[in-house]
Amino acid sequence: MTSGLPLLDLLACPHDGGTPLRQDADALVCPTCELRFPVSDGLVSFLSAQQLSEQDHKERSHRDSEASWYDAMFEGYTNAVEVPAGVRRIGRPTGPVLDAGCGTGRITEALLALGQPVVAVDYSEGTLRLMQRRVKEAGVPVLAVQSDLRALPLRPGVMAAVTCIEVYAQLRADDRRKLLVEFDRVMAPGAVLSMSAYNYNLVFKAWKLRGNEGAREGFHMLGGDYYYIRMTKDEYRRELEAVFDVEELTGIRNIPARSLAQGLRRLGLPTAGDRLLDYMVRTGHRADFWLENVPLVADNVGFFWQAKARKRDD
């Protein structure tokens, strides 16, 4: 990993309107409000100076403690589909890219392959440290930033593109709006946002009809503290269009490869299940990409919505 310290010029104080920061030994300092933001092993932390709710602190604590499990959860078919779907929609940016809610760096790694520097932001130090290890050989600058996404410590108009994968659906309505406004603030004119959300698809609508209250919104079972909501296409589009011009909105992860493999294992065919999943990871996921262009399928069975939205001209 090439040091992200040259990217420090992109940062600004999130508390006083975006004052540029100055370096002072092991911290960045705001010359206006005099707040100090520690820098440790290439990671800049703004979290201690940000006002997080009790719920936010619980979620961050769980993310820290489950960072390794979280990293392993996205291996295989999930990454084979989600990473290319999220990254290819920003095209070939000609400037720094923001990976918002970077987690352990699965998207960050793919963004660095585009050859542009990346600012990787998350509120979990545990996942940020795993991200740093993942991309240490990238050869392209990446800056790890611990921060609340709703108050990004970035100067206005500095990001050529933004990715935000598996974050939006974890926020309630007011916070989703704050997130979009912050993205708009830090994006350069014409910059593209690639962002996913949970799809309230036919499967979950059927679950809802059968009395499953968690089909629409609720809290993830693991940890018990992660809110989520599944959205219809119209709902997601309306929220995005309040701030951005939406250029594409389609369902992704249209083939339930892991569920099919698990079904074969339950039928006493573990080898067949393993072979199916291996095939889908190596080659079969390309069919998932093709189905993104078939609205009748993608809109109704895709697990996620994947959006491409562009910053409006001022």
Residue ranges and their predicted role:
Residues 177-189:
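A short glycine-rich, Lys/Arg-flanked "PGG" loop and its adjoining helix->strand segment in the class I
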Residues 2-56:
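N-terminal auxiliary segments of SAM/dcSAM-dependent transferases
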Residues 217-235:
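Acceptor-substrate binding/catalytic loop of class I
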Residues 9-12, 41-93, 106, 110, 194-217, ...:
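Conserved class I S-adenosyl-L-methionine
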Residues 252-314:
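A C-terminal cap/extension of S-adenosyl-L-methionine-dependent methyltransferases
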Residues 163:
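A conserved beta-strand element that flanks and buttresses the S-adenosyl-L-methionine
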Residues 104-151:
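Class I SAM-dependent methyltransferase SAM/SAH-binding core
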